[in-house]
Amino acid sequence: MIDCGKDWLRRVWDVAPTAIVLTHAHPDHAWGLADGAPCPVYATEATWALLDHLPIRDRRKMPRGKAISINGVKFKAVPIQHSIRAPAVGYRVSIGSRSFFYAPDIAGLPNRKRTLGGIQVFIGDGAVLTRSMVHMKAGQLIGHAPVTAQLDWCESAGVARAMFTHCGSGIVRGKARQLNVLVRRLGRMRGITAGLACDGDRLILAARPSA
């Protein structure tokens, strides 16, 4: 399970994941663990420093920039730009030869071609579609990059598919079908299959056919 926001409080015990991996310490990503966790929790040192108050027994440090294996799945924490107070990472997740990049809150992605190169799917920030929520503070980008900017990153890195999650109120309260059509169109303009992620969706990373 990646992230456990406050709306998952208590429900996480019913889900009973085998591991939880955190991107950053904002309430909508980590405060579902206010009553503890039913499994090991992985986070960067910067995130753990902000979560000292949570009664999590099995705390494991996630190194930045180095892949580790969790239950047979490789996770590589990549520093991204989103918040100064709660430094965030995105995760390059690999299973065999297939991989995806997950960053539900992101304003900027340094070294994007290297980070996204070779992935099959980009799963990004759905806070806003076209209106930027990014500004500069202390020399760092903070906030939320629009879907259009993230699609540009994917295009430049040769990523063929993109999904957007953690959607903002304008999307959640809007007409989902029409907005999804718009996202698909924005993707097609860049040669990318794109869409909005919905509750219950499943993403299958099919194995590459053998030669």
What does each model-identified segment do?
Residues 1-25, 31, 109-114:
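Pre-active-site segment of Zn-dependent metallo-hydrolases
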Residues 1-15, 87-104, 121:
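Conserved beta-strand hairpin/beta-sheet module of binuclear metal-dependent hydrolase folds
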Residues 2-5, 57-62, 101-107, 144:
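Short gly/ser/thr-rich secondary-structure transition/capping motifs
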Residues 3, 12, 24, 75, ...:
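Divalent metal-coordination and catalytic microenvironments
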Residues 25-31, 48-50, 66, 83-85, ...:
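Active-site environment of divalent metal-dependent phosphoester hydrolases
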Residues 40-47, 123, 163:
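Short internal beta-strands
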Residues 43-89, 94-97, 197-200, 205-206:
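Metallo-beta-lactamase
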Residues 109-201:
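Cap/insert and terminal regions of metallo-dependent hydrolase folds
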